[in-house]
Amino acid sequence: MKLAVLGLLCVPQIVCAGLGRYATLVHADPAQPSRRSDVSSIRVTYLGVNGYQFEADGHALLVDPYFTRACLSDVALQQPIRPNPAVVARALDHVRPHVDTILVTHGHFDHLLDVPLVMQKTGARLYASNTAVKLATAAGAPPSRCKTARPGASFGTGPWQVNVLPAAHDRLFGRAPYSAAAPLRKPERPRDWRLGEPLAFLIEANGRTVYIDSGGRPELLPNTGGKRVDLAILGVALPDSRTRFAAIVRSLRPRFTLPSHQDNFFAPFVRGFAFGPLTDFRFVIRTQQEQQLPGKLILLDYFHPWTIP
C-alpha cells in the first residue's frame, strides 16, 4: 500500500485543475443573501474534501470537517500527522462560532483528524461510528460529547433530524484503505486512523432533506424510506463510487446532485479547488447526461454558501 500511494506522487493533475471550465455548474448564494434563507431552507457551505456546514434557523451542523491537509509524502511514508491549529482557525472563520453537532462518515484522517480540535473551538458534539468515536477520544475529544451512531439510528439535534444509514468505502488497489482489524490506539500515523464502519446520513430541517455519504460501492444503495431527497451529496473519489453513480442517483431521485470528495485533499485549501489525481469528473458529467439521470448536477466552491431552493 505504501509504495502504491507513493506512486501517486507521479500522477499528473488533470489539465484543468480548478472549477473554471465547469462555471455553469457552480452554485452560490448572492453576496448578500436574503435573511429568509436562515429560516425557510438549508444553507450549504462546502468546506473541502468531504466537509460541509449546514445551517438552518441560526444553527449549524458539520459533516467531516478536515482542513489540515496532510501532505501526500507524509501519508505515503506513514509519517506522523497532526492537526494544524493555524490552518484550522483560518478555515473556521467560514464556520459559525457555535456548532450543534459534527457527523463523521468514517474514521480516516481526511474525515476525522481535525474533529477534536473543531469540537474544542465550536462546542460541538460528535456522532460517528464506534471506531471513529474511539479514535476521536484517543486524540483528545471529550468523551462526554461523543456519541456512537449506528445504522438505523435516528436522533434530533437543534432543528435537525438525522437518520443514520449503512454505507461502504471505495476500494483502492483492491481493498478499502486502513480497514485491517487492529487494536485501536492514540492515532499518530495515517494508518492509525482506521476505517471502522462507514456511515451515510439523511439530514432534515425546514422541509428540506439532504443525503450525504463519502463514497460507496455498486452493491450497496441507500434506503431512505421513500423520503424525497432535495440534495444528494455523493462521494466520487474513486472508481467504485463512480461506478455506482447512476444507480444511486436513480435510487435517490434528488432535485440536486453534488459530487463530493473529488478535490486534491493533499493541497492546502488556500490554493483553491483543484481536482484530485484519481478523480474523473468528466465521467460523472458524461454519466449524468448520457443516462439522463434525474435532478440537476451542481458543484460548490470552497466557503461559498448556497441555499437549497
Which residues does each PLM region occupy?
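Pre-active-site segment of Zn-dependent metallo-hydrolases
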Residues: 34, 59-104, 108, 113-117, ...
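Active-site-proximal loop/helix segments of hydrolase catalytic cores
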Residues: 184-251
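Active-site neighborhood of phospho(di)ester-bond hydrolases with catalytic His/Asp-centered motifs
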Residues: 63-64, 98-107, 127-129, 211-215, ...
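Zn-dependent metallo-beta-lactamase
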Residues: 10-86, 169, 189
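Beta-strand-turn-beta hairpins that frame and shape the catalytic cleft
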Residues: 37-42, 56-61, 154-163, 204-210
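Flexible, acidic/histidine-containing loops and adjacent segments that form or flank the divalent-metal
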Residues: 151-199, 206-208, 289, 293-309
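Active-site environment of divalent metal-dependent phosphoester hydrolases
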Residues: 50, 70, 107-113, 133-136, ...
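Binuclear metal-ion centers of metallo-dependent hydrolases, dominated by the metallo-beta-lactamase
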Residues: 137-154, 250, 255-309
